[in-house]
Structure formats: C-alpha cells, structure tokens
C-alpha cells in the first residue's frame, strides 16, 4: 500500500474511532466531535508502535485544510448576524475574552517563575492549554529568532501535545461545571437568546393602533414622518369593514385601524403620535388579502434596495418584515436584498404571486451550493491570513494565519451576501457537512501527531507535571471569567459557552457548545464575535512572554 493510501486509511480509522468515542455519553454529557482527538491519540500510539510511516506532508495539508474549512463555514454561517451582534453585545463579549487571555498569560508567568519550567516547555504548555496551534508556531518562530537551540525548540511541540488534549477537556469540563453550578436549562437559554435576536437587540413586534390624532386626519401616509420612515412598516389599514394594503399615497382618517411592524420603542413612539392600541383583529382571514413568506432567489434583485423595487406602487404589496439568517429585521427601504432572505408579503393573491416571481421564490435553489464563491472566499482568506504585520520591537512579523484569515474573510463575505451573480449563501445542510468534515480532518491529524510519544512522555517523562500545569492555565481563566460573566453580567449560557470556546480559539469546544442545543446559533455567534481579536492576542502572547522571560533571564 502506498504512503498516500495508508495515510487516508489511517485517517478514516481515526475518524471512526473518534466519532464513536464522541458519541459515548455519561449523564447526557459526551465529548462530541472532540472525541476525534482522542481517537487520533489512540490510533497514533499503535501506528507508532507498529513502525508505520505516514506521509507527513499530506498530514500537514489535511490538517490545515480541515481547519480552513471549519472556520470558513463558521464565518459564512454567522456573518449576516455578526456585525449586528458586535454593535449590541460585542464589546462586552470581547472584554471578557480579553480578560481570559490576560489571566492565562499571568498564570503561565507565575508557573514559569515558581517551578523554573524551561521557556520552550512553558510556551508549549501555554499554547496547548489554550488549544491554539498558531500560538505554537509563533512561539517556535520567536524562539528560533532569539537563538534557542533546535532541540529545545522541539520540546515546545511535545509539551504542546501533552497539554492540548486536556486543554480541550478543560473547556468542556468548565462548560459542564457552569451548567451544573447555575442549574442551567439549555432550552430556556436558547429561547431567551432567540427572543433577543434582531438588528438592534429588541424583538420585532406588531401592534394595531386606532388613528385618534385629529392632526393626522386626511393626511397621506407619506406625509406622516413616523409612518414614512424606515423604523416602522404599516402593512395593513382597516376602515370600517374594509381591510387593504396601504400605499404611501393612502389617505388616513380618524378611526382608521393601522397594523404596524417595528421594534417596541418605535411602536411606543407611534402610539404617542397616532393613538391608542386596540384589540381589534386585522387578520387577513376572510378577506381578499393574504400573508405569505417568499424567499429571495432571483439573481437580478440581489443587492437592490427594497424601495428601488417599488412593490407598493407597482403591485400594492407591502413587505412587513425580513428574516436574514434567522434574524428578524424591519423591512426598511434602505435594506439591500441578499440571497436566501425571507420576506413577509401582504397583499392580494395575484399581486403576491407577481412579486414572488420577481423575487424568485425558487425553493430548489436554496439546496444548491455555488462552489465558485466558496473557493474564492477561501483563497482570499488565506491571502489575508498571510499578510505580515510588523510591530516595533518584535523580531518576527505577526500574521492571522490559516485560521484567522479565512474566518475574517468569511464574516465579511457573509455580511455582504452577494457581489453581482456571486452569492455566499450556503444551505444549512451543506454548511454543516463541510464544517463537520473540516473539524474531523483537523482533529484526526492533531491526534495522530500527538499519539506517537504521548504514552512514553506521560509515563516515563515529565508529562504528568506538564499536564498539571496546562490544566491550571486552562481552568483558572475559564472558571474565573465564566462565573463573573454569569453572576455579574447575567450572560446567556449558550452565548457564554461560545465566548469561552472563542477565547480559547477552540473549534472542538465550539462544536460541543453548538451541540448543546440543536437549533440555537448563540454559541457560534459569540464565538465569531470574539475570535478575530482573541486570535490576534493568542498569536502575540507567546511572543510577548518569550521576549519578557528571555530579557529577565
């Protein structure tokens, strides 16, 4: 059997063993996708004992490509809601994540001085404990630049391998422990997160208001500022027993009932101007109007603003709200349509059918994946991650690397949505398949590389003490900040788990957090919110520690 065939076969075996381990649960808690790492260590040990030779170049390519696939699909998934989340809660999340990095660096410095751990070893333990491979590479590079002998630099890789598996376990254990301590109901947390997801952090509401302000009598809707803006949509008007879709030129009269859509604060302002809320139903049942949800799939309308399509004027149809990647938005005129947007339309059946034809509403297109944008995005992400950033006083340039670059590029492209006929929407099933494939490939290789000398170092060397040091570097920051975030900031549990995983730049921990609830995207969103800044800090922290320890001896 050729080296390539043998390598692929071993990787498949690792995936099977690891996924089996991950599916084993104790009291409902399992390793999930993180089990692949331990499957790799087990198989790697026996591969080493049998003297098998695997293709190191192929393993390296598979590891990096798997990581790229994982972070890219995460970015595409959360991109549409990422920047809205950043405005609402991003500062708080990033402050907690930075605190985790700082505490981890302090614990590392204390361990280095107290136990006189060699610099390469402690940097490797730090990188493994925070499960950050780019930190390992950055640390090795600066050690070489500082003139450290190669045999000492290689020790960094072994100590990294010792700390890495238990770094992952530490994150999973912390999530589980916090869940037990605070008696978290995951379903309740998911519902609370879902209820707070909108562009401004408030749930989109509807309200029926009676026109009671005499100053509004006989005015056109376009002449009433609060109804002609982008914060509130008037989707229905009822006069006596007649229900109709209002247009900008529709004249309102005292006693008219208006069905308004918007955020609670804006609807409250509308009440102050227009009149009181009423319990009268403005349902389309039994009328010649209907409400339908239509999906944007026509490439000709991508990137166009809602107001430029003139649906009200041409078809007498109102877009009452817009759902983008699970986030409910007020359908303001300035919003540009993206592939996969779901629009709530109100109008007559024939008019809605005409608008649906304009928008596309081709359900089969939602199941298709455009592969060209995928590889364009990955290529641009790799280029972004390869750009060196020179910082005064640093002997080596800093880079986002193959993990940070594709993630940031995917966030940007996911937010843009489309450029011309290229759209970065990816069906959820396809996104999940690529994401799971990527993380399985990445963890399989990491486990295989660690498995060869893992048992020997653990039993006969200083492996146990290295693991202990790594456990402290992992656990102390996570537990401290986790308790603070829950007690002081009342942070949502799923959001907190994503923040903890992101603060350790740990894809397996994110996979575990995602599996806590089958449909909630809270963990992925908070992970992506903190990941870019934390990745940069994780890359420069070992370099800062190396320069600091080297200078003070």
Curated annotation (Swiss-Prot):
Alphabetical GO biological process terms: potassium ion transport
Predominant place of localization: membrane
SUPFAM superfamilies in UniProt: TrkA C-terminal domain-like
Annotated membrane topology: Multi-pass membrane protein
GO-annotated cellular components: plasma membrane
Keyword DNA-binding part of the UniProt annotation: no
Species assigned in the record: Escherichia coli (strain 55989 / EAEC)
Entry's localization field: Cell membrane
RCK C-terminal domain residues: 191-276, 279-361
Family that this chain belongs to: Belongs to the AAE transporter (TC 2.A.81) family. YidE subfamily.
Keyword Transferase in record: no
Keywords: Cell membrane, Membrane, Repeat, Transmembrane, Transmembrane helix, Transport
GO molecular function: monoatomic cation transmembrane transporter activity
Domain of life: Bacteria
Membrane-traversing stretches: 4-24, 28-48, 65-85, 95-115, 158-178, 371-391, 393-413, 439-459, 464-484, 493-513, 533-553
Gene: yidE
HAMAP family in the record: YidE
InterPro entries (alphabetical): AAE_transporter, RCK_C, RCK_C_sf, Transpt_YidE_put, YidE_YbjL
Identification of the protein by name: Putative transport protein YidE
């Amino acid at each position: 059997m050729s080296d390539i065939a043998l390598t692929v076969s071993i990787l498949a075996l690792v995936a099977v063993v690891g996924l089996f381990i991950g599916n084993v649960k104790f009291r409902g808690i399992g390793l999930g996708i993180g089990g692949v790492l331990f499957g790799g260590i087990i198989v790697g040990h026996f591969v080493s004992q049998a003297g098998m030779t695997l293709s190191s170049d192929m393993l390296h390519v598979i590891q990096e490509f798997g990581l790229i696939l994982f972070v890219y699909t995460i970015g595409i998934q959360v991109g549409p809601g990422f920047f809205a989340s950043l405005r609402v809660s991003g500062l708080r999340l990033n402050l907690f994540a930075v605190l985790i990095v700082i505490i981890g660096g302090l614990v590392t410095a204390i361990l280095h001085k107290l136990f006189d751990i060699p610099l390469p070893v402690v940097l490797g333990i730090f990188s493994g404990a925070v499960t950050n491979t780019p930190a390992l590479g950055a640390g090795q590079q600066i050690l070489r630049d500082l003139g450290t002998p190669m045999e000492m630099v290689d020790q960094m890789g072994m100590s990294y391998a010792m700390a890495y598996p238990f770094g992952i376990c530490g994150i999973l254990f912390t999530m589980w422990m916090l869940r037990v301590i605070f008696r978290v109901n995951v379903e309740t947390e998911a519902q609370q997160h879902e209820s707070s997801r909108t562009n401004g952090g408030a749930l989109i509401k509807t309200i029926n208001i009676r026109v009671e302000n005499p100053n509004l009598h006989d005015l056109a809707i376009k002449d009433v500022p609060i109804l002609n803006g982008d914060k509130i949509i008037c989707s229905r008007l009822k006069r006596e027993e007649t229900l109709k879709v209002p247009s900008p030129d529709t004249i309102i009269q005292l006693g008219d009932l208006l069905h308004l859509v918007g955020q609670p604060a804006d609807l409250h302002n509308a009440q102050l101007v227009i009149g009181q809320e009423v319990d009268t139903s403005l349902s389309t049942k039994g009328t010649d109007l209907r409400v339908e949800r239509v999906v944007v799939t026509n490439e000709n309308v991508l990137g166009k603003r809602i107001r430029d399509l003139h649906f009200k004027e041409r078809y007498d149809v109102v877009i009452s709200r817009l759902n983008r990647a699970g986030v409910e938005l007020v359908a303001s005129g300035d919003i540009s349509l993206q592939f996969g947007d779901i629009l709530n339309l109100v109008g007559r059946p024939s008019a809605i059918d005409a608008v649906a034809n304009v928008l596309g509403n081709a359900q089969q297109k939602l199941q298709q994946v455009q592969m060209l944008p995928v590889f364009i995005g990955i290529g641009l992400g790799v280029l972004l991650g390869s750009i060196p950033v020179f910082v005064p006083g640093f002997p080596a340039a800093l880079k986002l690397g193959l993990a940070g670059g594709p993630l940031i590029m995917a966030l940007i492209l996911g937010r843009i949505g489309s450029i011309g006929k290229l759209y970065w929407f990816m069906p959820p099933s396809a996104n999940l398949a690529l994401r799971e494939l990527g993380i399985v490939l990445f963890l399989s290789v990491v486990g295989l590389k660690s498995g060869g000398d893992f048992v020997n170092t653990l039993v006969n060397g200083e492996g146990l003490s290295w693991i202990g040091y790594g456990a402290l570097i992992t656990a102390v920051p996570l537990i401290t900040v986790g308790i603070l975030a829950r007690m002081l900031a009342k942070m949502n549990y799923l959001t907190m788990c994503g923040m903890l995983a992101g603060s350790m730049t740990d894809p397996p921990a994110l996979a575990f957090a995602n599996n806590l609830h089958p449909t909630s995207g809270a963990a992925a969103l908070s992970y992506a919110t903190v990941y870019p800044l934390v990745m940069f800090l994780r890359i420069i922290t070992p370099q800062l520690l190396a320069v600091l320890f080297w200078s003070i001896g």
